[in-house]
Amino acid sequence: MEYSKEDLMEAKRQILGVGENMGTEESKKIWEKNAQFWDDAMGDESNEFHREVVRPKVTELLSPDPSDYILDIACGNGNYSSYLAQRGASVVAFDYSKKMIELAKRRRSQYAKQIEFCVADATNRESLLGLKRNRAFTKAVSNMAIMDITDIEPLFMAVYELLEENGIFVFATQHPCFITLTEKYMTPHSYYDIAIEGQPEEQIYYHRSIQDIFNLCFRAGFVIDGFVWTGS
């Protein structure tokens, strides 16, 4: 019997992780190892997928302008932070990988007056509230990251507190319908996989249904007033 590459990858996911609750510290260690590769792969302007698929729709929903003070969640090497800075916004950008933040600061040094890069843990409410500054954030954004975060409830709750009244939170994520086995769709689970071919370590993905994600939004106090789906 012959198996396609997709069949083998799905079997690998099931063997390595489905149903396990792999934690934040393990994920953090993986991203420390992947940081240099990720910075090299994303470069100054991000990769084609982010530039052509993710960024246009996120920017359409976020509608950034020079008056904005924006929280960039799980910022990686800061490619979207610098994109916002180019449009005049001020940004606080964080990631839980110290190595990634070091690389972001180095790569985006020309935006030092507009972007403040920080290390913070998106699963820890106190760590997140430590990002509070004298001015409330007008907007918050997360590009293709919440599926990499062990527990997003503390994040959603803290972001609501950090935003000004009627502030905007935009996040992009994989569509959960198309990245897991149908019978597993309603069951939160985690698995190992890669995002970019050649990365040193497989990262951990945390599957949640759209229902799970939206209910967390509602519990935090958000009202969903925009939703965009796009094929990759």
Language-model regions: role of each:
Residues 3-65, 79, 83, 103, 168-197, ...:
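Conserved class I S-adenosyl-L-methionine
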Residues 173, 196-211:
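Acceptor-substrate binding/catalytic loop of class I
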Residues 69-126:
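Class I SAM-dependent methyltransferase SAM/SAH-binding core
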Residues 204-227:
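Short alpha-helix
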Residues 138-153:
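A short SAM/SAH-binding and catalytic strip from SAM-dependent methyltransferases
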Residues 128-140:
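A short acidic, Gly/Pro-enriched loop at the edge of an enzyme's catalytic core
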Residues 153-168:
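A short glycine-rich, Lys/Arg-flanked "PGG" loop and its adjoining helix->strand segment in the class I
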